[in-house]
Amino acid sequence: MSLTKEIQQAICKAEIKKGNHVAENFNYFFPGELDVISVAKSGYVSELEVKVSRSDFNADAKKRKWHFYNWALQYPLSQSCQTPNYFTYVCPVINGKAIISESELKPYMGLIYFQDGELITVRKPKLIHKHKHDIIRLLTKMITVNNWHHYYGAQKLTIQNREAIAANDEYLKEKVNNSIKHLPRL
């Protein structure tokens, strides 16, 4: 099992113990893919982003999702907010050194270290906005995405796209074969 997957599973177990609903690699409703999404009974959503290398952490700063977080901070009462309520980085401690330090974080970000199979909270995240998300809608989507991944190995649109491409390829082969049949022989 990869280190990322090991950390994701540890996060999910900890969040489930708190009574929250979780999903890994969730990419609906929010910008980008969330390594772990945790939905509390309150309707507040947490994004837990796993980083296992410095280059991964540095690349994260360039992602488009930060525009959405900045917007949520600027307009915290917006009902159309498409960002989680909390954000936390989770990284391993390797040879006694953490990949991310607290001083590198924005004020609202939380930080958790993963060391020797344990999660250690370094800093709790601050509430980004007070918009409560529709739990039924989120959980329905989480279950649907999980089912498609579990039973089909991909998301519904990916499967539908593959089927459409296969049907298109078959159609094109038939057209080419029919065209070749009608060519004059030399």
Residue ranges and their predicted role:
Residues K13, I99-L186:
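Non-catalytic C-terminal interaction segments of nucleic acid-processing enzymes
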Residues E6, P31-L34, Q79-Q82, Y86:
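Short, well-structured alpha-helical interface segments that form or flank functional binding sites
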Residues M1-G32, V39-K41:
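Acidic-basic catalytic patches of nuclease active cores, encompassing PD-(D/E)XK
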Residues K51-M109:
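Catalytic cores of nucleic-acid endonucleases
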Residues L34-E47, K51-S53:
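Active-site beta-strand-loop-beta-strand hairpin of nuclease catalytic cores
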Residues I11, F26-N27, V36-S38, Y75-S80, ...:
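Short, flexible, glycine/charge-rich loop motifs used to bind or transfer phosphoryl groups or to couple energy/partner
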